[in-house]
Amino acid sequence: MKASGTLREYKVVGRCLPTPKCHTPPLYRMRIFAPNHVVAKSRFWYFVSQLKKMKKSSGEIVYCGQVFEKSPLRVKNFGIWLRYDSRSGTHNMYREYRDLTTAGAVTQCYRDMGARHRARAHSIQIMKVEEIAASKCRRPAVKQFHDSKIKFPLPHRVLRRQHKPRFTTKRPNTFF
């Protein structure tokens, strides 16, 4: 999978094709994060074939639809449990992100894993994504924003204007 652009959350439901032995095969549902519905269906078959004796040729997708965030204007903390294949083996990991949407947090996770661990999107498997309360957060990078009186410093910028002289009679004002 290529994690291009912002990923979307899909709910994919599939099952085996009905046979004379089993008239109503059980349905399997998955939350898949993918750039589009075609990739979401493909990932569903990839994961389901690992878990159950099921293949695309002997199964069908019953439903595939995008899941939209309930409150996309509220900043939330997300905990993401994942496994990924590195050059030395397979690792489990728990990560925390702050974002407006679940899909945004997962996209952030894919970018972060690529930057910090050189993990490509195809080698990352998201196992669970959960919205977590501020009191349950563990990572200091997320906890630092849980202050109600948070302040951000104004940068001390020195503007270099191109067509102004380098030396002048008055001091520059760099406090904005």
UniProtKB/Swiss-Prot annotation:
Name the UniProt record assigns to this protein: Large ribosomal subunit protein eL20
| Protein's job | Component of the large ribosomal subunit. The ribosome is a large ribonucleoprotein complex responsible for the synthesis of proteins in the cell.
**From which organism does this entry originate?**
Homo sapiens (Human)
**Similarity comment: family membership:** Belongs to the eukaryotic ribosomal protein eL20 family.
Q: Choose one Gene Ontology CC annotation of this protein and give it.
A: cytosolic large ribosomal subunit
A biological-process GO annotation: cytoplasmic translation
Residues annotated as carrying Phosphotyrosine in the record are Y63
PTM Phosphoserine: list the residues: S71, S123
Known partners and oligomeric status? Component of the large ribosomal subunit. Binds IPO9 with high affinity.
A Pfam family per the record: Ribosomal_L18A
> Quick one: which gene encodes this?
RPL18A
